[in-house]
């Protein structure tokens, strides 16, 4: 059986959403808004209603081997960076869960994907598991430091 390797298109885009947090814990940007850098990577000539979403708590991974290999095999992939793109030591994991929720909502509502499959590379694996658990049964009301966000109030949608 011959293996097909699709050529693909990489479409960078931004996800911008309202974030009611009373302070800005990253370096720049409009107060009350969060901006996530994302890449939609689609194989040419392979339509799909399913997309595989990758996110890592810190740093970018849109050029890692796994997302690229999946696209070359015919799968649609989104790599979405969190609000902590530069190995930021200010990371608050609960906020990254909110970021992943914004990416999943955008994939379903704006991009039109019916199914979202969560995938993870390193810290992205634990992030994906935490996200899905909180989307299905939210229990986290604040960070360990007693600060927002509450994932109960985040209106996360399951992947």
Predicted regions and their residues:
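A generic membrane alpha-helix/interface feature
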Residues: 74, 92, 99, 138-142, ...
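Short, surface-exposed basic-aromatic patches at helix termini and helix-loop junctions that form
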Residues: 68-76, 98-101, 105-110, 133-137
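Primarily recognizes the serine-hydrolase "nucleophile elbow" in alpha/beta-hydrolase
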Residues: 106-109, 114-159
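Catalytic nucleophile-loop/oxyanion-hole region of alpha/beta-hydrolase
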Residues: 83-117
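Short, surface-exposed "cap/lid" segments of acyl-processing enzymes
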Residues: 34-37, 41-87, 106
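N-terminal cap/lid segment of alpha/beta-hydrolase-fold proteins
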Residues: 1-50
């Amino acid at each position: 059986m011959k293996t097909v390797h699709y050529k693909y298109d990489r479409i960078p885009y931004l996800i911008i959403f309202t974030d009611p947090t009373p302070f800005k814990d990253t370096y720049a940007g409009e107060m009350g808004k969060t901006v996530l850098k994302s890449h939609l990577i689609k194989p040419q000539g392979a339509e799909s209603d399913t997309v595989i979403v990758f996110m890592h708590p810190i740093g970018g991974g849109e050029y890692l081997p796994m997302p690229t290999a999946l696209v070359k095999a015919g799968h649609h992939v989104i790599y979405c960076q969190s609000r902590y793109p530069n190995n930021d030591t200010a990371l608050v994991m609960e906020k990254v869960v909110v970021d992943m929720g914004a990416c999943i909502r955008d994939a379903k509502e704006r991009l039109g994907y019916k199914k979202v499959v969560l995938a993870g590379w390193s810290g992205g694996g634990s992030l994906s598991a935490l996200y899905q658990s909180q989307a299905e049964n939210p229990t986290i009301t604040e960070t360990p430091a007693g600060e927002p966000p509450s994932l109960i109030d985040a209106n996360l949608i399951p992947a």
